[in-house]
């Protein structure tokens, strides 16, 4: 079992340093109980890292990045210009219309594959000017 909170605590300082030039404002919230998933540690690190990197790469300068964990979920929200195609977003090599040159289009496809192998659901939605990625345990998934 892997604590997503611990993975985030290790990854966030380095990732925020790498993207500090974008002046992204990070808001991190967590509950007393961590979000623990049944997954190989290396795969959990790749899953979380790909989601956070995606939210940094595709954020605007001076944008927001909200990362929240509960005992049953991880929510990552970042500033955006417009909604993305939720059907195509998790496909390999998918790039949005304004796709970034430094994006391979693989990160979210890999994240979704790891999530599925760990009985997790990874979904996307557009909410109030923010891209929202939600990772939940399949047993906790709400319709």
Predicted regions span which residues?
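Glycine-rich phosphate-binding loop
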Residues: 101-110
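Short beta-strand/loop element within the Bergerat-fold HATPase_c
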Residues: 62-73
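Glycine-rich ATP-binding loops of the HATPase_c
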Residues: 118-127
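Short conserved segment of the HATPase_c
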Residues: 82-94
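Conserved micro-motifs of the catalytic ATP-binding
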Residues: 36-39
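Short helix-loop "hinge" at the ATP-lid/N-box region of the Bergerat-fold HATPase_c
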Residues: 54-56
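A conserved beta-strand-to-alpha-helix junction within the catalytic ATP-binding
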Residues: 1-16
């Amino acid at each position: 079992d892997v604590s997503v909170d611990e993975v985030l605590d290790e990854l966030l300082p380095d990732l925020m340093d790498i993207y500090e030039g974008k002046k992204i404002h990070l808001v991190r919230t967590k509950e007393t109980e961590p979000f623990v998933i049944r997954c190989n540690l290396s795969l959990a690190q790749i899953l979380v890292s790909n989601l956070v990197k995606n939210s940094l790469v595709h954020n605007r300068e001076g944008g927001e990045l909200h990362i929240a964990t509960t005992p049953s979920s991880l929510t990552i929200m970042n500033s955006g210009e417009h909604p993305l195609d939720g059907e195509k977003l998790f496909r390999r090599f998918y790039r949005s219309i304004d796709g970034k040159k430094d994006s391979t289009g693989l990160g979210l496809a890999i994240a979704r594959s790891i999530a599925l192998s760990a009985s997790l659901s990874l979904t996307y939605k557009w909410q109030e000017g923010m891209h929202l990625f939600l990772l939940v345990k399949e047993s906790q998934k709400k319709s």
